Amino acid sequence: MSVDLATVKRVARLARIAVSDEEAERMTGELNGILGFVEQLSEVDVDGVEPMTSVMPMKMKKRDDIVADGDKADDIVANAPNSDRNFFLVPKVVE
């Protein structure tokens, strides 16, 4: 597949990108190069190759789920100018 100047201008218009004639000509070559590389990739035999998300093997670090109340309410409301029974008190702004 090759991209011509009209296709580049049409895609730029659809993407709402202002492209000058010189830029469109340059992009035509660049897009054709990219598409050529993609065509090369489609020729690679990947039968039997498992999909991967990274080139390095990675394992997710897992932790045990421990239910806790946090016990930080007093520390949190200590920063508030006004509080009552671990609730923030704020001035009334809406009638």
UniProtKB/Swiss-Prot annotation:
One of its GO terms (molecular function) is asparaginyl-tRNA synthase (glutamine-hydrolyzing) activity. It catalyses: L-glutamyl-tRNA(Gln) + L-glutamine + ATP + H2O = L-glutaminyl-tRNA(Gln) + L-glutamate + ADP + phosphate + H(+); L-aspartyl-tRNA(Asn) + L-glutamine + ATP + H2O = L-asparaginyl-tRNA(Asn) + L-glutamate + ADP + phosphate + 2 H(+). GO terms for biological process: glutaminyl-tRNAGln biosynthesis via transamidation; regulation of translational fidelity; translation. Gene3D superfamilies: Glu-tRNAGln amidotransferase C subunit, N-terminal domain. Keywords: ATP-binding, Ligase, Nucleotide-binding, Protein biosynthesis. InterPro entries: Asp/Glu-ADT_sf_sub_c, GatC. SUPFAM superfamilies: Glu-tRNAGln amidotransferase C subunit. Its EC number is 6.3.5.-. NCBIfam families: gatC. Belongs to the GatC family. Allows the formation of correctly charged Asn-tRNA(Asn) or Gln-tRNA(Gln) through the transamidation of misacylated Asp-tRNA(Asn) or Glu-tRNA(Gln) in organisms which lack either or both of asparaginyl-tRNA or glutaminyl-tRNA synthetases. The reaction takes place in the presence of glutamine and ATP through an activated phospho-Asp-tRNA(Asn) or phospho-Glu-tRNA(Gln). Heterotrimer of A, B and C subunits. This is Glutamyl-tRNA(Gln) amidotransferase subunit C.
